[in-house]
């Protein structure tokens, strides 16, 4: 009887969904819609929020940033004070929930080139970056990758 219970526990443990938390422990509650966040940002400089999406890519050098598809948009997400990193590989296409601060920011040519280098872009692609970009940015306090 003890063996049957032990086997059932092992099977049930193997069936649980794997969730990985990075940074601050967050929950999947109160996930905002990106369009409503963008609308709210028109009235304030930044907003604390929780969003979700699908990981497109992560920094292959350190895991210090990720690109996430949220609906029809793509967000570039960095992590608060470089206090944590996400996996450098193996998470593309996975669902992600992230909590932190959304705001508009100017991304310099130097930073864009740095991120392009990290992502393994060609020299020709990097040389085509010549203008600063003003875009929606996100600094995450915590991340859940499912």
What is the role of each PLM region?
Residues 15-146:
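OB-fold and OB-like single-stranded nucleic-acid-recognition modules
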């Amino acid at each position: 009887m003890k063996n049957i219970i032990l086997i059932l526990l092992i099977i049930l443990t193997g069936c649980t969904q794997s969730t990985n938390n990075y940074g601050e422990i967050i929950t999947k509650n109160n996930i905002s819609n990106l369009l409503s966040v963008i609308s709210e940002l028109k009235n304030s400089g930044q907003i604390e929020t929780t969003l979700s999406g699908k990981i497109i890519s992560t920094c292959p050098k350190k895991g210090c940033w990720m690109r996430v598809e949220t609906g029809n948009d793509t967000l570039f997400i960095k992590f608060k004070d470089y206090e944590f990193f996400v996996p450098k590989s193996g998470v593309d296409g996975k669902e992600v929930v992230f909590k932190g601060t959304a705001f508009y920011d100017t991304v310099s040519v130097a930073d864009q080139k740095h991120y392009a280098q990290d992502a393994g872009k060609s020299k020709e692609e990097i040389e085509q970056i010549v203008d600063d970009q003003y875009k929606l940015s996100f600094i995450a306090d915590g991340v859940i990758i499912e």
